Amino acid sequence: MTGQRIGRLLCVLLAGYALGAGAQSAAPASPPSAAPVPVRGIDTLQRIRDTHAIPIGIRDASFPFSFVDRDKRPQGYSVDLCLEVADAIKSELGLPRLEVRYIPVSPDNRIAALQDGKIDLECGSTGNTRERQKEVAFAYTTFVAGIKLLARRSSRISGIDDLRGKTVVVTRGTASEKLMKDINAERMLKMNIVVAADHDESFRAVDQGNAVAFPMDDVVLYGLMAKAKQPDDFAVVGRYLSVEPYAIMMRKDETQLEAIVDRTLSRLFASGEIRRLYDKWFATRELTVPLNPLLKEAFAMPNTYPAWP
């Protein structure tokens, strides 16, 4: 199957889906250190070779992709994937050790952290969008999510039209922030859209009655519900407002680094190891998210297609 045919197939699948519905061999991680010198135009792999360290961006509260546990240790699906990449870099460069430095980032500063050289990989829950592709590069898709609404069951919110004239919370710097502002203008819903600093703050706004709904990628919403004191008080509702592939984010024009990342992911996909990692985080007693058809396609035919619409 040609690349163009695969691309058309994925676009059809995306449209239908939206409308119808430290590495084990690496050294232990150290606390975040001072930001590296900006690296525009510098060979990142050479810097890693010289310093024996790679700074990766992580999130504090993007369960189960990238979060800090009770012992303040970075964990998650995306973190595990980046540790696989770190191990591959260590091997490819012939390094006896490679220190993984965890640098906290937020939706608001993650792209700047890459561009300024504070991190070499962003390992969170970042969607691959056309707008972001203008500023950064994305590795192969590792998850496919869709934006839905989180609301209290008692609110009787069932979809976007129920939000007319109501207060809605979005997380700053996310695709859902722009999407909801666009929908608000296009449909003249007169929503009061408030912006929170992170997903935990957005969830609290709904929990405390300061907003009736929180639009975000469904898997992130399920993760927040799983951690709530009363998960059954909440529901993820409505049709998909968009479909968004997640991927590891890198600086543009880092062709050698990008090649290592994609080779590592291709190996995980082809060997089936990706299913073990998926089940580790998405098929648990705490959180169960079935592998959806779009992600199966992404594992079978690795790609960097952006979000739809």
What spans do the regions from the language model cover?
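Periplasmic-binding protein-like
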Residues: 60, 143-154, 218-219, 226-265, ...
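Extended ligand-binding regions for polar small-molecule ligands
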Residues: 27-45, 80-88, 154, 161, ...
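A ligand-binding cleft/hinge motif common to bilobed small-molecule-binding domains
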Residues: 108-109, 123-134, 179-186, 207-242, ...
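Bacterial N-terminal signal peptides that target proteins for export
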Residues: 1-11
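Extracytoplasmic small-molecule ligand-binding "clamshell" domains
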Residues: 29-122
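Acidic, polar ligand-binding/catalytic clefts
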Residues: 83, 87, 94-162, 301-309
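Ligand-binding clefts/hinges and TM-proximal coupling segments of bilobed small-molecule sensing domains
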Residues: 32-39, 178-194, 232-234, 265-309
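Bilobed "Venus flytrap"/periplasmic-binding protein-like clamshell domains
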Residues: 55-64, 74-91, 127, 145-199, ...
